[in-house]
Amino acid sequence: MNKFIAALLIALLALVACTSDAASSEAELPEMDLDAFVARLESSAKPAVVNVWASWCLPCRDEAPLFTSAHAEYGDRIDFYGVAYNDNQPGARQFLAEFDLPFTHYFDFDGDALVRFGGIGVPRTYFFGPGGELANTVNGVLTEDTLTSNLEELLGS
């Protein structure tokens, strides 16, 4: 019985090691070039939502599925972006894989986006009108109603 448990433990450790290697070989999130990002927002005719999150943030994990759903419904009319803040690449990649967030994400370890757009802590969500004008900011976890009302406001509904 002890040999069976030892063999099972070795197999489990090997599986974990293989899984870790697979995750570390995935492409890293691109570092955020904040000036280029702001220029993209300012030159866009579409409104945008920027969600700042971290894989270690429990409220961020709570609201992540809302962004997947919102992107499915509004993604053709509103640009969605995610910014991983004060995180590490493996944690950020695992978070994205777990929640299947199907839009562009950037890595911002130092929190330059929070400084530039205003605010501290995560989660934090910025809503920009066409041309990059900041329309609203929500600090803390979003509810479905709050997210939907902000998205509808961006669209002028």
Short names for language-model regions:
Residues 95-101, 109-155:
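Thiol/disulfide oxidoreductase modules built on the thioredoxin-like
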Residues 61-99, 109-115:
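Structural microenvironment flanking redox-active thiols in thiol-disulfide oxidoreductases
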Residues 18-22:
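Bacterial signal peptide processing site
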Residues 40-61, 67:
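Short active-site neighborhood of thiol/selenol oxidoreductases, capturing the structured segment around
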Residues 27-47:
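A short beta-strand-turn-helix
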Residues 1-8:
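Bacterial N-terminal signal peptides that target proteins for export
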Residues 49-50, 80, 125:
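Hydrophobic beta-strand anchors of alpha/beta hydrolase catalytic cores
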Residues 13-17:
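C-terminal motif of bacterial Sec signal peptides marking the signal peptidase cleavage site
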